[in-house]
């Protein structure tokens, strides 16, 4: 195994959008491949036709590309070990299943779903673990042949079951969990490797594909631990060398401590949703990488190259990874602030699209509006956790208040508030150049004239000018709001004092 080239795979089913957990699996395999100058294979496991959705494969690929994950072989790129869709490999599976049947490792099973259900109920009544009961137990070869002939005469379609060796322990050195041992007697008996419709099951197809595609390492979620002994049994039957396995811990909701489930609506769980909200791909790459993997040192922000250089599966956590929404927002904010410095046009484009989608700006804005939006976005960059947040953050420019809140009235109840506002309004009306620099100047003039400073100066001016107690830099906010709107706001406030 040590001499084998590093080849890993990400093998999604096209059953929907890219989930956070699956994105993490893809990302860790990508980092492992790139760190070792290895190969990443994208394989589409689409044998469960009932669960496949239209454009599911396309959606997976688009979101992987958006995250910055590229692969070396796959259905869109080809390679020496294709086809890379399981639905196109049925002839391969059929041939190998026949080999197992011919050698006695597998057999036709005609037990109906009703019979299997009755078996499970009887086992439950006996306080036994659910398991498949061998239907040909105690039969001679002739009796077995007669039973099969009778089933066929009834028009029953068989499944193919793999004969799991009992009283055997399957062990492997897991690169995440360490040594794992599972007793074959706990596996539920002989398991299906080919369904009645002729399609292979997951546990069979994945073994065949991993072997034929020369996969050296399998990094996947620890919900697959129970599948591993079944897969090892198939490797043994063929005499194939299995890959090295590594099973990553599950992801839990940091707020509830429960396993992250697709039914948990308190957390957005699909990459597509974060794209639509204006999360940046590099930020998502960074955050997801730290879900269950620890870098050297205390830093939390890394470039992709730094992650590739550091990545070692031995640093994958043995404890569940906590999905912390606030932490994700913090990480994305760091990238937004960096993007404002390195590529402000990209950030502008994303945020402008959100403003248009929310109906805050016309769908075909003129150059003056675009420049105004550019200044607005720059004003809120430090506060923005994701670009779709811009409409809510900047609501003072779009949602006009018509009355003061109780808290605002309390702030303006001070004897100094009215003279400060009146002095400010007078100077705003007379201001020749209405820009942030000049506005900052008249605020200082009001300070000198009224002898009021600090909160008692700035809070009345902010409330009067913007109808809000809080916001970004005051002078810049007033400039973007415009003289006419500011004076309307001032008149509204003074009318309520």
UniProtKB/Swiss-Prot annotation:
Q: Which UniProt keywords apply?
A: Aminoacyl-tRNA synthetase, ATP-binding, Cytoplasm, Ligase, Nucleotide-binding, Protein biosynthesis
* Alphabetical list of PROSITE patterns matching this protein: AA_TRNA_LIGASE_I
- Reply yes or no: does the keyword Transferase apply: no
Q: Does the keyword Cytoplasm apply?
A: yes
Q: Which CDD domains does this entry report, sorted A to Z?
A: GluRS_core (cd00808)
Detail the disulphide connectivity of this chain as listed in its UniProt entry. none
Tell me its family: Belongs to the class-I aminoacyl-tRNA synthetase family. Glutamate--tRNA ligase type 1 subfamily.
Protein name, as recorded: Glutamate--tRNA ligase
Query: Gene name?
Result: gltX
